[in-house]
Regions:
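A conserved ligand/cofactor-binding region detector
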Residues: 1-179
Length: 179
């Protein structure tokens, strides 16, 4: 790279890492999608399109604090689709929007990672650090990958997130089967 006037550090920083989580299960899922693409098999992944994904830790006034990590930019691999689904919860319905990321395998084979987002998400509800009203599901469902679930509101939000993803994914599969 150096012989061609390129710097590996600059290349590594050129594109932000999708802040979709890099824990064991997320990494394993990514490897599976890549492997199935490489083998030429059909198999797409489903997840949630978190606006802030993980969070960053910074020092302010000699204190460690957490701040949102806005990984989504206009220069993203994420492709907005026209696909939407209504997700019905008790007492409310929210609209999901599907975004796609191509997962490229060896020899140009590929599959897709379908990420669902809530159309009514509101990034402005994030307060000090990464705090937000966890009970306003219509505005917060896809804000953070790991919302604080140390209280009932956080645990209920996680259940809403899981239900939202499963419902949107199931509707997508049923729609494909009907074609």
């Amino acid at each position: 790279l150096a012989q061609n006037g390129k710097n590996i550090c600059e290349i590594e920083e050129f594109e932000k890492e999708p802040s979709l989580g890099n824990g064991g299960l997320g990494r394993l899922a990514a490897c599976f999608i890549d492997s199935i693409a490489t083998l030429g098999l059909n198999g797409d992944g489903v997840g949630l399109n978190y606006h802030f994904g993980l969070f960053r830790q910074v020092f302010e006034n000699n204190m460690q604090t957490t701040v949102p990590d806005p990984w989504l930019t206009e220069k993203s691999w994420l492709t907005k689709t026209d696909v939407t689904y209504d997700i019905k919860f008790k007492g409310m319905t929210v609209k999901s929007r599907m975004y796609d990321i191509d997962v490229i395998g060896y020899n140009n084979t590929s599959n897709k990672l379908h990420l669902f987002d809530i159309e009514s998400v509101d990034e402005s509800i994030v307060e000090d650090g990464i705090n937000f009203n966890k009970e306003d599901i219509k505005k917060n469902l896809t804000l953070f990958l790991y919302p604080d679930d140390s209280d009932d509101a956080g645990r209920i939000l996680r259940i809403y997130q899981q239900y939202f993803m499963v419902s949107a994914g199931a509707q997508m599969i049923l729609e494909e089967c009907e074609k």
